[in-house]
Amino acid sequence: MKDVVTSPANLGKFQDPDVTADGQTRASVALSHPETLWFNTGTLCNIECANCYIFSSPSNDALVYITESEVRDYLSQITERGWPISEIGFTGGEPFMNPEIIGMTRAALEAGHEVLILTNAMRPMMRKSMRAGLLDLAQDWRDRITLRISVDHWSEALHDEERGKGAFALTIEGMQWLRDNGFAMTVAGRTVWGESEAQSRDGYRSLYAEHGFDIDADDPAATVLFPEMDETAEVPEITTACWDILGKSPSEPMCASSRMVVKRKGAEKPAVLACTLLPYSPEFELGETLAEAERDVKLNHPHCAKFCVLGGASCSG
């Protein structure tokens, strides 16, 4: 399984890790300030979205369930390497499909980290065992747990267009439970429908007001509007000269501040990846340990350019 199929518009690009198609030095990013370590809990999901970047579905187990013991090992490595990690993120798939998500979350909290869980807040989260687990964690660590809810669009019709009929209502039900039990929430939306950012934020603001959700529609970290990853679009390669031209710093892309741990189907051990967006590209797999994952990342993928450098996206909260 690949992350992207090279489109005709990008033929000849993103081939050599060191040099762009026109012979310039390709930009790279150092792990300058590790702040977030992500764990992919597995690619299994309770739904199959129309345009999921990681192809999560009820049948895709390309990334299998990571275990609590494996997570604890990486938490120990954080201490050993002296990484100043403030946040542990859990993503999927749907994290609440993984039967050990509560234990993994507890391990991260016990280690002193903030925890961010990306979820659709649907039936997996609303199972009795998961709700009980969240409430138990909240007794000691409520102020260090945030759930980022996938609300692709503020309207039911367009959200369900992406996620299936009835998905919006189930997500709102889950958010209402989180609201009623005092959990901090943020929202991840999308920009595929051609609205301006102001229009999108106005729509989310109305949604939050309707349901009494304490979420700031104007804060880009609280209502995250992700740019679309159009695999057919032509994108420029990022050279070392681009930083000054664009007025950006190599400390800004996600790979300057985060890594993601995954466990591939059939693999004996988990692996550490440079980026949450490229789970299937071998060149972005850095090794099995955090020590191996400290090396620089060459921006040799269309997503690096369009989504991270030009789109300015970040997965952290």
Q: Could you describe each region identified by the protein language model?
A:
Residues S59-D73, P95-W141, L147, V151-L170, ...:
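Canonical radical SAM enzyme core domain
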Residues M1-D3:
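N-terminal targeting signals for export/organelle localization
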Residues A209, P227-G317:
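Accessory C-terminal segments flanking Radical SAM cores
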Residues D73, Q77-R81, A107, L137, ...:
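A generic secondary-structure signal
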Residues T36, T146, S257:
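Broad gene-expression machinery/nucleic-acid interaction feature
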Residues P84-I88, V115, W141-V151, G166-V235:
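Conserved C-terminal portion of the radical SAM core fold
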Residues T6-S7, L11-G92, F96-A107, A111-E114:
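Conserved alpha-helical substructure of the radical SAM core
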